[in-house]
From Swiss-Prot:
This is Adenylyl-sulfate kinase. One of its GO terms (biological process) is hydrogen sulfide biosynthetic process. NCBIfam families: apsK (TIGR00455), PRK03846.1 (NF003013). Keywords: ATP-binding, Kinase, Nucleotide-binding, Phosphoprotein, Transferase. SUPFAM superfamilies: P-loop containing nucleoside triphosphate hydrolases (SSF52540). Belongs to the APS kinase family. Its EC number is 2.7.1.25. It comes from Cronobacter sakazakii (strain ATCC BAA-894). It comes from the Bacteria. GO terms for molecular function: adenylylsulfate kinase activity; ATP binding. The keyword ATP-binding applies. InterPro entries: APS_kinase, P-loop_NTPase. Catalyzes the synthesis of activated sulfate. The keyword Mitochondrion does not apply. The gene is cysC.
């Protein structure tokens, strides 16, 4: 990775993050959904974004598959590539938070160190870790993309939960049971956002 060039300097914006938040009527923050493939991350994040949009909240959803079509299309699934994938997403999320958006991200992000890296990038009070905790057996039974079947057959290497480790969050801001109904999970998330004064009660 290229090193920082001392000739490249940060230019302050005439419009501040606080002014952007005032315009939107809410704080900028990231809800970082993490869990195994098939745990329900994207489904719950998508449902929450729709609910927040209906409440007049300015949102954007960054999905693990979608960013690999463009921003991270040059990356594979080695440990180094996974780390770079998450670093890039964290930087994009940080820009969106600075713009005053509520950003939802749905990434397996299997390593605690990478999730902590993004938390550190964003700063205090800007990162909400959402652990969608679904047993491997349930994820494998769902297998919406047929990836577990391929991994079990040896057609897919470095697949999280099969031959690559998933490090579960130790103290997420919210721990969701991925076997519950999406409506129940969404209600828990909306309650959290109200308690944190990110959206109005």
């Amino acid at each position: 990775m290229a090193q920082h060039d001392e000739n490249v300097v940060w230019h302050a914006h005439p419009v501040t993050a606080a002014q952007r938040e005032q315009l939107h009527g809410h704080r900028g923050v990231v809800l970082w959904f993490t869990g195994l493939s098939g745990s329900g991350k994207s489904t719950v994040a998508g449902a929450l974004e729709e609910a927040l949009h209906q409440l007049g909240v300015s949102t954007y959803l960054l999905d693990g598959d979608n960013v690999r079509h463009g921003l991270c299309s040059d990356l594979g699934f080695s440990d180094d590539d996974r780390k770079e994938n998450i670093r890039r997403v964290g930087e994009v999320a940080k820009l969106m938070v600075d713009a005053g958006l509520v950003v939802l991200t749905a990434f397996i992000s299997p390593h605690r160190a990478e999730r902590q890296m993004v938390r550190d990038q964003l700063g205090e009070g800007r990162f909400i870790e959402v652990f969608v905790d679904t047993p491997l057996s349930v994820c494998e039974a769902r297998d919406p993309k047929g990836l577990y079947k391929k991994a079990r057959a040896g057609e897919l290497r470095n697949f999280t939960g099969i031959d690559a480790v998933y490090e579960a969050p130790e103290s997420p801001e919210i721990h969701l049971d991925g076997q519950q109904l999406v409506t129940n999970l969404m209600a828990q998330l909306l309650d959290l956002l109200r308690r944190e004064d990110i959206i109005k009660s």
